[in-house]
Regions:
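Short hydrophobic beta-strand that contains or immediately precedes a catalytic carboxylate
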Residues: 55-59, 280
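Acidic-and-aromatic substrate-binding clefts and catalytic sites of carbohydrate-active enzymes
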Residues: 87-91, 203-208, 234-243
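Alpha-helical transmembrane signal-anchor/signal-peptide segments
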Residues: 26-46
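Histidine-centered active-site loop/cap adjacent to the catalytic His
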Residues: 276-299
Length: 299
């Protein structure tokens, strides 16, 4: 009787699993044409740099829009790989994809966005869109908890992939061909008159904080120089969120993982941002890069 029940359950469950997998693994033509391809390109670059000391940038789009990696590479005389794509890939996947390619002596610049809820750790629908399209093998790096959190986005991912079928729209600054050889969002960009601002909370999700501690432990054990920095943030948004940002910085210090620079060091005038509080203009990215260089030279 027990075996019979198990067989019935398997017969009932397997079709559901098959449908879920089909929905999950569908590729998205928007993602195929977008800068999301940088997830795979960055992995391939790091793989080819095995045995070479390098600089790796891990962040959301504040990293993609916020560095001139050529300046960084020329100044430090090291190859630079900017892995940054989208904050909603989630910090866990941003790190797990690449961590086995890091080697002793590498410099890893880690500057995640301020949003610090569970979604900052596990990501959202963009994670499924980008991974399914460009690097399905990365799903093997997801933990049980990560899957439990992400399954709610499968239906949304599937519907958007269907909607984007055959897309030929020019994605402009977000297009795959807007990425340079380092992984930077390199298309020239100037300040837009209206910036998207963000509301923040001043405390970090406990599970997210624990993963940040894990990153620090991993770097120490592997002999990696981890440079943990606050993201760049526009001046007007910083003024409205200053108390929350300072509270978050204090929490990081209390957890034993302090920022290596105060948040205000990477706050710039609104005119140096492109379209959001995190996306620097071309000139803004150069200024931010030079500020980071000052920190790297002190290592």
């Amino acid at each position: 009787m027990r075996r019979f029940i198990i067989k019935i359950l398997l017969i009932a469950v397997l079709p559901v699993v098959a449908v879920m997998l089909r929905m999950l693994l569908i590729t998205d033509d928007y993602s195929r044409r977008s800068h999301g391809v940088n997830v795979r390109l960055a992995y391939n670059k790091l793989d080819k740099l095995s045995g070479t000391q390098k600089i790796v940038i891990i962040a959301g789009s504040n990293g993609g829009f916020g560095f001139n990696s050529k300046i960084l590479s020329d100044s430090m005389r090291m190859p630079v790989v900017n892995t940054s794509v989208h904050a909603s890939i989630g910090v866990r996947m941003q790190f797990e994809i690449y961590k086995d390619l890091f080697e002793r002596g590498d410099i890893v610049i880690f500057c995640p966005e301020y949003y610090n809820g569970k979604g900052r750790l596990y990501g959202g629908e963009p994670l499924l869109r980008i991974v399914s399209t460009h690097m399905p093998s990365a799903y093997l790096k997801m933990s049980v908890k990560h899957w439990q959190y992400s399954l709610k986005y499968v239906w949304q991912h599937y519907l958007e992939a269907i909607e984007h079928r055959g897309m030929t729209k020019d994605l402009g600054i977000f297009a795959a061909n807007a990425i340079n050889e380092y992984g930077d969002m390199a298309m020239p960009r100037e300040h837009k008159p209206t910036l998207i601002h963000y509301g923040l909370i001043g405390s970090m999700d406990e599970e997210t904080a624990e993963y940040y501690r894990y990153i620090h432990r991993f770097a120490k054990e592997k002999g990696i120089k981890l440079v943990y920095l606050p993201p760049t943030f526009c001046e007007s948004n910083y003024r409205t969120q200053k108390a929350n940002i300072q509270m978050l910085a204090k929490q990081m210090s209390a957890l034993g993982i302090p920022y290596m620079a105060p948040p205000e060091r990477f706050v710039y005038a609104d005119s140096l941002y492109y379209d959001t509080s995190y996306h620097l203009t071309t000139h803004g990215a150069e200024l931010r890069t030079k500020a980071v260089l000052e920190i790297l030279r002190e290592l």
